[in-house]
A protein has these predicted regions:
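A short acidic Gly-Thr/Ser loop motif
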Residues: 1-4, 25-27, 144-152
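Short beta-strand scaffold segments in enzyme catalytic cores
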Residues: 3-10, 32
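Short helix-capping/linker segments at secondary-structure and domain boundaries
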Residues: 37-44, 126-128, 192-203
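C-terminal helix-coil-helix/basic helical segment that borders enzyme active sites and/or dimer interfaces
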Residues: 126-136, 143, 166-175
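Glycine-rich phosphate-binding loops at beta-strand->alpha-helix junctions
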Residues: 138-161
Length: 247
């Protein structure tokens, strides 16, 4: 998972399209925006969650619950996706202004906004994932990637609220992928599959039920060289063959 998106892989399913994917909430957007606002642009994120950790004892739970209860997106059913058009810097600014007016410290503000993100993830799991699980309803493993992987306050809250789940960064998974490299690797894979004309299974909750080629290729000056590398045939495309693709 990223801090604003969840992808659920059933442990027992051998069907590629059995996975579930949706956006959980603001991710790092609010935290990063609040850091810029509170430091006059000198800091763009909470490095290692240091500032938020100092304010954890002063988290304003009422603000967390109020936001998560009254933002309609959190009650919206799947499939759903969102972005900065909803979870914007302006929303973060309104929370910062409200807390500053109440005399809250910078540390408390960052901790509270971090908790909004972390708790939005937990509630999304409880609402959309746990009901689909068989047996004891426990999520076995949660792997974090992206910027949130480097904010221990998020990870700590997830582990606290989901004590029977293993919460780790993505590099602890069998793939051992660097948490910050996953998206780049994914785009490279999608580009490879797009050039090969290989469709990708869509999530089980997606409005489209048909596998689709994910992405559009914009050829550059070395496009033919790229095709040769991808398909493994120096005569491609003159022979009108796809080449040797090993997956």
């Amino acid at each position: 998972m990223r801090t604003g998106n969840a992808t659920i892989l059933p442990a027992t399913s051998k069907t590629p399209s059995a996975y579930l994917a949706f956006d959980t909430g603001p991710g790092n957007v609010f935290i990063d925006a609040a850091m810029r606002i509170l430091t006059n642009g000198e800091q763009h994120y909470d490095h290692n969650g240091a500032l938020g950790a100092k304010g954890e004892a002063d988290i304003d739970g009422a603000i967390v619950d109020d936001y998560l209860t009254n933002e309609p997106y959190f009650q919206q059913k799947l499939p759903k996706t969102t972005g900065r058009e909803l979870f914007s810097d302006d929303v973060a600014r309104s929370i910062v202004t409200k807390m500053k007016s109440a005399g809250k410290s910078t540390e408390a503000i960052i901790a509270t906004i971090t908790r909004i993100t972390a708790e939005s993830i937990v509630r999304a799991y409880e609402q959309f994932v746990v009901p689909l699980l068989e047996g004891d309803g426990i999520i076995d493993e949660i792997y974090i990637c992206g910027g949130g992987a480097y904010n221990p306050n998020i990870k700590k809250h997830l582990q606290s609220r989901l004590p029977k789940s293993r919460v780790s960064n993505l590099d602890a998974a069998p793939s051992k992928l660097d948490p910050s490299a996953k998206e780049a690797i994914l785009f490279a894979l999608l580009g490879f599959l797009a050039i090969c004309g290989r469709p990708v299974p869509v999530a089980a909750d997606a409005e489209s039920k048909q596998p689709a080629i994910m992405g559009v290729v914009t050829p550059g000056q070395n496009y033919h060289d790229v095709l040769q590398i991808v398909v493994g045939d120096p005569d491609f495309p003159s022979k009108r063959v796809l080449g040797r693709v090993i997956m």
